[in-house]
């Protein structure tokens, strides 16, 4: 009964509670006054990579003394001192005592900027909304059913108070992803979205990501592996555990700042690894299926299967890859004999608005020389018993999730991400890998005349000229690769800037669109509900 009351209250708040002129924001210069709370990740600092006239140059920072704070301040200092397009942020730091209570008492701004700490994001956002602050988070806003309910309440309270609670999603602004979504909505070209089956989903997302990133620590040339879902910098060819050159001719090389393949994980621990990696993928899937439409998660999402399992990393491989003499204390809880059993792998199959969907996340140890590569054979990890750890080197396409593997370059070196949408007339496959620009491949349905299909594809791309002019195609096996002009590509800082600008627009509006709220809740319901249920069982 309590749950029903909460949901009804939230639904009531989301439906029509917005009133004209409810926002104090007008778009005036410097009116958005940032409060940075407990910084911990790169994306948070990237929000300040460029000056925005709507954001006040004085930023108040509340955080405990430590590496997270110092790393954030170092990045801001780098932005302020770079030779070109230098910023002029004035950072006012408070790092003593109970920083959260002090911030809530002083409230020296109107927008709280939260960083990548999944464990605390829900509590921080609830406290800020309760204190009358808008919230922009670079961290997933919920992990576990209690935090999901807290997010529901916070969104309802934000709407009641005329505040905006929003999660930064720069992945939405990648041009290849936008083109994939646009083509999927072109019924004449794509046809209807096929439904698939539990055994063979029609929408498939697969990710193979590093469990750690190698970072230089302080002095000398020693390296240390830091736990979390972080990836090698895009320009770091030595970080490719397969030993293959990232500048493969099948891919366009990405600029160094295009995508750092990192997640805000240093302070998260490994327990939220699957959620952190899967959240942006599910966000893209929802946009592909629904566009900017509302989702009723308790009606339009049903779960087929879900499991999380650890990656088994031999301790000797960790020590060799990290150059460490001994296992750090943070990893001791994951030690089993001479093997580290590190959480983060997982597979989720569910039905989204009638479409069977599969999401797979797997991890590897960079520097071990045994990263998994994409193949069409089922993975050992996919068929292992649930109580058995899968080797971090297990390779292959997850069993049954073969949509998007036909007709595109195979044997992709890790890290890589793939998102495939199977339609009546074509399959749209977005492929990303570290060090290369994301590519969009279009595979015609079986029996389709290739020449006519190419003409149809060019016509469909021509209709997207307002979104991206100058698109072309080139054959790639039995598929066609969409050739995207270089000027249409944006680096990660620019995508973060676009996401932040969208948030500022919502501040002026006074509330986010209903579809944003619905899709945020649907995303976390998808990420949390099936795994909580499986643990209870």
Ranges and model annotations:
Residues 2-7:
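Sec-dependent signal peptide recognition
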Residues 281, 345, 367-378, 399, ...:
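C-terminal helical cap and adjacent loop that interface with cofactors, partners, or active-site loops
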């Amino acid at each position: 009964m309590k749950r029903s009351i909460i949901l009804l209250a939230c639904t009531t708040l989301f439906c029509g509670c917005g009133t004209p002129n409810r926002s104090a924001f007008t778009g005036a210069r410097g009116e958005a006054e940032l409060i940075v709370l407990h910084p911990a990740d790169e994306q948070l600092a990237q929000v300040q990579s460029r000056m925005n006239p709507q954001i006040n140059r004085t930023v108040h920072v509340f955080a405990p003394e430590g590496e997270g704070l110092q790393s954030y301040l170092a990045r801001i200092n780098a932005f302020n001192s770079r030779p070109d397009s230098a910023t002029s942020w004035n950072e006012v730091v408070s790092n003593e005592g109970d920083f959260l209570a002090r911030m809530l008492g002083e409230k020296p701004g109107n927008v709280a900027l939260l960083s990548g700490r999944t464990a605390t994001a829900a509590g921080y956002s609830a406290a800020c909304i309760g204190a009358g602050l808008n919230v922009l988070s670079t961290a997933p806003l919920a992990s576990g059913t209690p935090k999901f309910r807290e997010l529901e309440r916070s969104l309802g309270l934000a709407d009641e108070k005329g505040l905006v609670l929003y999660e930064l999603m720069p992945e939405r602004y990648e041009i290849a992803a936008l083109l994939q979504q646009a083509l999927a909505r072109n019924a004449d070209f794509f046809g209807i979205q096929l439904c698939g089956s539990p055994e063979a989903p029609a929408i498939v997302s697969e990710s193979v990501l590093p469990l750690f990133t190698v970072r230089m620590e302080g002095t000398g040339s020693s390296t240390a592996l830091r736990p979390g879902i972080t990836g090698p910098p895009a320009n770091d060819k030595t970080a490719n555990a397969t030993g293959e050159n990232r500048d493969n001719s099948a891919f366009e090389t990405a600029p160094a700042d295009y995508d750092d393949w990192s997640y805000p994980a240093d302070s998260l621990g490994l327990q939220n690894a699957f959620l952190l990696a899967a959240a942006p993928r599910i966000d893209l899937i929802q946009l592909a299926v629904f566009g900017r439409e509302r989702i009723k998660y308790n009606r339009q999402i049903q779960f087929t299967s879900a499991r999380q399992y650890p990656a088994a990393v031999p301790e000797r491989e960790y020590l060799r890859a990290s150059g460490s003499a001994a296992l750090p204390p943070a990893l001791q809880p994951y030690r089993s004999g001479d093997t580290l059993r590190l959480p983060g792998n997982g597979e989720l199959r569910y039905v989204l608005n009638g479409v069977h969907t599969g999401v797979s996340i797997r991890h590897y140890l960079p520097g071990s020389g045994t990263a998994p590569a994409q193949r069409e054979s089922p993975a050992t990890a996919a068929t292992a018993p649930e109580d058995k750890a899968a080797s971090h080197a297990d390779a292959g396409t997850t069993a049954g999730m073969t949509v998007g593997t036909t007709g595109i370059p195979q044997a992709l070196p890790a890290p890589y991400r793939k998102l495939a949408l199977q339609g009546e007339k074509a399959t749209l496959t977005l492929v990303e890998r570290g060090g290369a620009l994301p590519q969009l491949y279009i595979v015609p349905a079986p029996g389709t005349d290739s020449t006519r299909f190419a003409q149809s594809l060019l016509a469909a791309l021509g209709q997207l000229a307002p979104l991206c002019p100058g698109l072309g195609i080139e054959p790639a096996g039995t598929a066609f690769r969409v050739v995207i002009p270089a000027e249409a590509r944006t680096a990660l800082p620019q995508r973060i800037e676009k996401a932040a600008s969208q948030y500022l627009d919502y501040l002026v509006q006074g509330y986010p669109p209903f579809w944003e709220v619905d899709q945020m809740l649907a995303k976390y319901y998808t990420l949390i509900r099936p795994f909580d249920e499986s643990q209870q069982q």
